[in-house]
């Protein structure tokens, strides 16, 4: 298995321990800041001229958080760092979001909703470890990339053949962006995009994303 992983994507170069710590600390702070922003926007209305951004609804959805986690994972220096950075991001996000909720908003968070995000935070290092290989080469990279693109496709589109359409334009942008950040070369990216179509249809018609709590 290690041979397959190393063949898919190799760790390039080493970074110093202080720099690694700073990167993880930044991920933690970034997550905390995003959590605070998300809750602030949930409780406060933006000026009317910014309504078109729809930031409150956007950050209340799952897709942007998964997209940030994917970016942190694939652009980390190693799969281990990917897991650490993504975990730090989600821990920071949860702390920021729920501290703001309980201290400044004056009420306690919904427990089932909190548990969903706690579970995602716990499993995120293992998922990020695998996602790091999506920017590698070969069948494994294509497979991981196609699943990721398929997930964003499910967020972006209504995949009912009788009513195919974009569901939410910001998530359509994230779908396009996911293709961009996972791009390796034209041939490999084309394979990933093609394979993502049946994967997305499978996810949609089995309801798997809803079952695992991210749909």
Regions found by a protein language model. Name each.
Residues 1-94, 98-99:
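N-terminal topogenic module of multi-pass integral membrane proteins
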Residues 63-73, 120-132, 173-179:
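Hydrophobic cores of alpha-helical transmembrane segments in multi-pass inner/ER membrane proteins
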Residues 74-85, 132-142, 181-194:
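Membrane-helix interface "capping/anchor" motifs
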Residues 84-93, 143-152, 189-202:
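Central hydrophobic cores of alpha-helical transmembrane segments
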Residues 94, 122, 172-183, 199-204:
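Alpha-helical transmembrane segments and their membrane-interface exit regions
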Residues 99-167:
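Membrane-proximal helix-loop-helix units in multi-pass membrane proteins
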Residues 107, 157-168, 175-192:
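Membrane-helix boundary connector in multi-pass membrane proteins
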Residues 201-215:
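Juxtamembrane boundary at the C-terminal end of a transmembrane helix
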């Amino acid at each position: 298995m290690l041979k397959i992983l190393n063949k898919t994507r190799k760790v390039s170069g080493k970074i110093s321990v202080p720099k690694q710590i700073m990167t993880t600390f930044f991920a933690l702070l970034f997550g905390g800041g995003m959590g605070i922003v998300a809750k602030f926007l949930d409780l406060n209305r933006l000026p009317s001229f910014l309504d078109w951004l729809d930031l409150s609804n956007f950050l209340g959805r799952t897709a942007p958080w998964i997209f940030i986690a994917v970016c942190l994972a694939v652009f980390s220096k190693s799969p281990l760092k990917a897991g650490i950075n993504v975990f730090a991001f989600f821990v920071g996000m949860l702390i920021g979001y729920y501290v703001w909720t309980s201290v400044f908003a004056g009420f306690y968070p919904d427990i089932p909703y909190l548990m969903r995000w706690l579970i995602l935070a716990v499993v995120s290092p293992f998922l990020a470890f695998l996602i790091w290989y999506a920017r590698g080469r070969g069948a494994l990279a294509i497979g991981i990339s196609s699943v990721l693109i398929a997930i964003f496709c499910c967020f972006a589109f209504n995949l009912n053949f009788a009513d195919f359409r974009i569901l939410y334009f910001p998530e359509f942008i994230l779908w396009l962006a996911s293709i961009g950040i996972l791009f390796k070369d034209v041939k490999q990216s084309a394979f990933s995009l093609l394979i993502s179509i049946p994967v997305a249809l499978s996810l949609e018609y089995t309801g798997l994303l809803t079952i695992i709590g991210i749909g």
